[in-house]
Amino acid sequence: MSEAQTAVAAAAPAVKNTRTLVGKVVSDKRAKTVTVLVERRAKHELYGKIVARSRKYHAHDENGDYKMGDVVEISESRPLSKTKNWVVTRLVEKARAV
């Protein structure tokens, strides 16, 4: 590497790889917080059948923009409270009106 490339590499900030997940908002009752249900499919260890697994995450929603039924993308962040370590980054799909 030349001297110029070394200086540029040293000046560039370190890129942090954060996990991102996509899920459905199942609760928006708390202030600045939404509960997101993330579903995934996994193979059963003993029987080999593909089964649905799910987990709920509490995510930070600063302005209260996201409502029940919205599909959102969440990314991992620093701990914001006892149970909240995720932040909603974008809206993937708006909830359908029934």
Swiss-Prot record:
Put simply, this protein is called: Small ribosomal subunit protein uS17
Per its UniProt entry, which superkingdom is the organism in? Bacteria
Q: Which keywords has UniProt assigned to this entry?
A: Ribonucleoprotein, Ribosomal protein, RNA-binding, rRNA-binding
List, alphabetically, the PANTHER family matched.
40S RIBOSOMAL PROTEIN S11 FAMILY MEMBER, SMALL RIBOSOMAL SUBUNIT PROTEIN US17M
Quaternary structure (record): Part of the 30S ribosomal subunit.
What GO cellular component entries does it have? cytosolic small ribosomal subunit
Q: Does the keyword Ribonucleoprotein belong to this entry?
A: yes
* PROSITE patterns tied to this protein: RIBOSOMAL_S17
| Biological process annotations from GO | translation
Family under the similarity heading: Belongs to the universal ribosomal protein uS17 family.
Q: Which GO terms describe its molecular function?
A: rRNA binding; structural constituent of ribosome
Role description: One of the primary rRNA binding proteins, it binds specifically to the 5'-end of 16S ribosomal RNA.
**Where does this protein come from, organism-wise?**
Leptothrix cholodnii (strain ATCC 51168 / LMG 8142 / SP-6)
